[in-house]
From Swiss-Prot:
Family indicated by similarity: Belongs to the HscB family.
Biological process according to GO: [2Fe-2S] cluster assembly; protein complex oligomerization; protein folding
Originating organism: Escherichia coli (strain SMS-3-5 / SECEC)
Name of this chain's protein: Co-chaperone protein HscB
Transmembrane portions of the chain: none
InterPro entries with a match to the protein in the record: DnaJ_domain, HscB, HscB_C_sf, HscB_oligo_C, J_dom_sf
């Protein structure tokens, strides 16, 4: 059973996150291992396994990129295990330049420049994210997979920039 079905939700990217949260709580109550403490060993094991599956499904569906990757996996694009990478050389060059810029910001300990950098990367991420949403809605799986690969780069870059921000603020 796929994670969307487990939560009683349609298999699409845009979800009702409140319904997702409520269903998670219901499933957790229903399959919590403590409810099966007096059951047989097989029942206890099944409850632990079901609870782990529910938790994994929850983590996957509530995180936007993970949800997109999972949805793509249901359509034959297993991005988590694939060896493919972004083939867009202009995008890759831009990523290298952004990484170099982040390194320069770190060396200079320039908080104002870092703040501007983070805003720019967030805007780039948001623009690509909106494109991905449209591609998933239109079921253009190849294009959506390519966009998700690019979003991974931007997500890692954003995370690195935010870690640097914390480091500079603690300094």
């Amino acid at each position: 059973m796929d994670y969307f079905t487990l939560f009683g939700l349609p298999a699409r990217y845009q979800l009702d996150t409140q319904a997702l949260s409520l269903r998670f709580q219901d499933l957790q109550r229903q399959y919590h291992p403590d409810k099966f403490a007096s059951g047989s060993q097989a029942e206890q094991l099944a409850a632990v396994q079901q609870s782990a599956t529910i938790n994994q499904a929850w983590q996957t569906l509530r995180h936007p990129l993970m949800r997109a990757e999972y949805l793509l996996s249901l359509h034959g694009f297993d991005l988590a295990c694939e060896q493919h990478t972004v083939r867009d050389t202009a995008f890759l060059m831009e990523q290298l330049e952004l990484r170099e810029e982040l390194d320069e910001i770190e060396q200079a300990k320039d908080e104002a420049r870092l703040e501007s950098f983070i805003k720019r990367v967030k805007k780039m991420f948001d623009t690509r994210h909106q494109l991905m949403v449209e591609q998933l809605d239109n079921e253009t799986w190849d294009a959506a997979a390519d966009t998700v690969r690019k979003l991974r780069f931007l997500d890692k870059l954003r995370s690195s920039a935010e870690q640097l921000e914390e480091k500079l603020l603690d300094f």
